[in-house]
């Protein structure tokens, strides 16, 4: 586990260009699932946890051989509009691989903008459709999306 790596500052980058090396196809979650199936072993996944699944926690999970890690839910609306939110909500480094960002969004426009900004830095993108937190549901995020699937 490396704690001396430098986090990537997303606020200074062109959202369509990555300064990281190209993503390795072996870090793709689908590849990992197939590999684990071939090895006849379970896939070890550290699911998203509010406030805890940030980079230092993901590094600890890697140390203990976790195959796939998630970020905590990041609100697309705040991420695309606010540099402070980008800097506090997501950081990564060259060792942060097989990572899936979990996005909370209530509209397609913010979702697409966030995906455009973050996709060079992650190996998968998940839309949160299950968070039952009242504040999120009230905003039309998380579990609220299941009540209006056409949205």
Please tell me what each predicted stretch does.
Residues 1-39:
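Eukaryotic N-terminal low-complexity, Ser/Thr- and Lys/Arg-rich leader segments
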Residues 96-151:
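Active-site beta->alpha loop and helix N-cap motifs at the rims of alpha/beta catalytic domains
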